[in-house]
């Protein structure tokens, strides 16, 4: 999900600066991120039918291809299209592996969005400096506002409890340490896979509001839009929150901000909080190494996180 959110600045600039008709290929599960985006002419949803996808895109007679994923599937697609005007993002996978295994930093000091613009640079597409985007409807906003009355008051904190891999997910016992130290109301956000953790937190802290497993990606985004502060693991919803310029306290375990996937253009007072110095913890590009009782995110500084959150909201409401 986060990868799709992070492409939106390039999509916007390609449309606005070139006047281009922009088509985007994306997995069906994440196509909603681009719904109602005025810079996207058409979304091609991929569900595994490569030949059908290729036929549909060939029918569009594309003039240029910008591959911002650079995966096996996207490489196969761009090779099959045989478009002479093609840009490809450089992912620096080898350099990430070297850092993960040996803690030797050979990575460029730049955000992945800047890498995306480098891939598009040969076409005259330049970074306009604006944030990522998701375009919500009034109906989506109204639905969550009516369903969760608590989000209509301020200030309150959105906590994104989920993550794609265990190595990026703050454990339940750490949330149990953080939440009682927060002095403002809390709203939980997550998918169906996070309902067990949400239930345990709701049982321990009855005053919190849980939207976990109840909303679509876009509806969860509508909740984040109304938050005063977001605390999130390194996950797609962290990037969605950055679309709204929210202050974000991002929590890092097996992944590191050094890889360039930190919140883009997040709000003032945002901070990236790492579980332990990178030299002493497990690092994986996707955060998918095995975790156990020694999970690095058990060592997140609960007091520091709560102090920062309380300070940010106290200053905001002063």
What residues fall within each predicted segment?
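Catalytic machinery of carbohydrate-active enzymes
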Residues: 1-318
């Amino acid at each position: 999900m986060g990868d799709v959110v992070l492409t939106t600045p390039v999509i916007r600039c390609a449309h606005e600066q070139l006047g281009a008709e922009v088509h985007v290929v994306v997995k069906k599960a994440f196509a909603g991120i681009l719904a109602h985006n005025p810079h996207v002419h058409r979304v091609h949803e991929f569900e595994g039918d490569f030949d059908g996808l290729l036929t549909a895109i060939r029918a569009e007679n594309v003039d240029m291809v910008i591959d911002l994923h650079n995966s096996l599937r996207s490489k196969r697609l761009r090779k099959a299209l045989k478009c002479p005007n093609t840009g490809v993002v450089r992912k620096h996978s080898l350099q990430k592996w070297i850092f993960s295994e040996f803690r030797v930093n050979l990575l460029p000091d730049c955000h992945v969005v800047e890498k995306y613009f480098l891939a598009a640079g040969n076409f005259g597409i330049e970074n306009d400096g604006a944030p990522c985007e998701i375009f919500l409807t009034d109906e989506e906003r109204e639905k969550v506002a009516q369903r969760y009355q608590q989000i209509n008051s301020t200030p309150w904190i959105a906590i994104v409890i989920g993550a794609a891999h265990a190595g990026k997910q703050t454990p339940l016992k750490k949330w149990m340490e953080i939440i009682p130290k927060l002095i403002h109301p809390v709203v939980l956000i997550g998918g169906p896979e996070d309902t067990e953790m949400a239930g345990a937190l709701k049982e321990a802290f009855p005053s919190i509001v849980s939207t976990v497993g109840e909303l679509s990606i876009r509806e969860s985004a509508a909740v984040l839009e109304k938050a005063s502060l977001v605390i999130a693991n390194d996950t797609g919803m962290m990037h969605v929150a950055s679309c709204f310029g929210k202050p974000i306290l991002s929590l890092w375990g097996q992944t590191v901000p050094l890889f360039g996937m930190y919140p883009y253009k997040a709000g003032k007072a945002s901070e990236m909080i790492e579980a332990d110095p990178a030299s002493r913890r497990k690092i994986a590009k996707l955060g998918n190494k095995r975790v156990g009782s020694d999970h690095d995110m058990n060592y997140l500084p609960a007091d520091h996180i709560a102090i920062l959150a309380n300070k940010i909201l106290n200053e905001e409401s002063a």
